[in-house]
Curated annotation (Swiss-Prot):
The keyword Repeat does not apply. Signal peptide: none annotated. Keywords: Cell cycle, Cell division, Septation. HAMAP family: SpoVG. The keyword Acetylation does not apply. It comes from Exiguobacterium sp. (strain ATCC BAA-1283 / AT1b). Could be involved in septation. This is Putative septation protein SpoVG. Belongs to the SpoVG family. InterPro entries: SpoVG, SpoVG_sf. One of its GO terms (biological process) is division septum assembly. The gene is spoVG.
Length: 99
């Protein structure tokens, strides 16, 4: 399975979340709302999740092996790092792509 496209939407908010991403797999399947987060060890990609009635966050979609997780994270973070648009106001959304 190949990641055939990555779209990044930078967010203009304070805090650890830097951007949202969508990935396309094999030109056929899209996963939205991956989050690029600034952690204590640098940037990482969090999978889309939903809060349960008990208050626990559960992934909606996620890789089932480490190799695919590394592919997703590498593609998303590479696209994010190559973006050169500075966000000046919360209404501005920028897109980056990866192919």
């Amino acid at each position: 399975m190949q990641i055939t496209d990555v779209k990044i939407r930078k967010v203009a908010t304070e805090g650890r979340m830097k951007a949202l991403a969508s990935i396309t797999l094999d030109h056929e399947f899209v996963v939205h709302d991956l989050r690029i987060i600034e952690g204590s060890s640098g940037l990482f990609v969090a999978m889309p999740s939903k809060r349960t009635p008990e208050g626990i966050f559960r992934d909606i979609a996620h890789p089932i092996n480490g190799e695919m997780r590394q592919k997703v994270e590498a593609a998303v973070l590479e696209t994010y790092s190559n973006m050169d648009v500075e966000i000046l106001d919360p209404q501005h959304v920028s897109y980056g792509t990866h192919e």
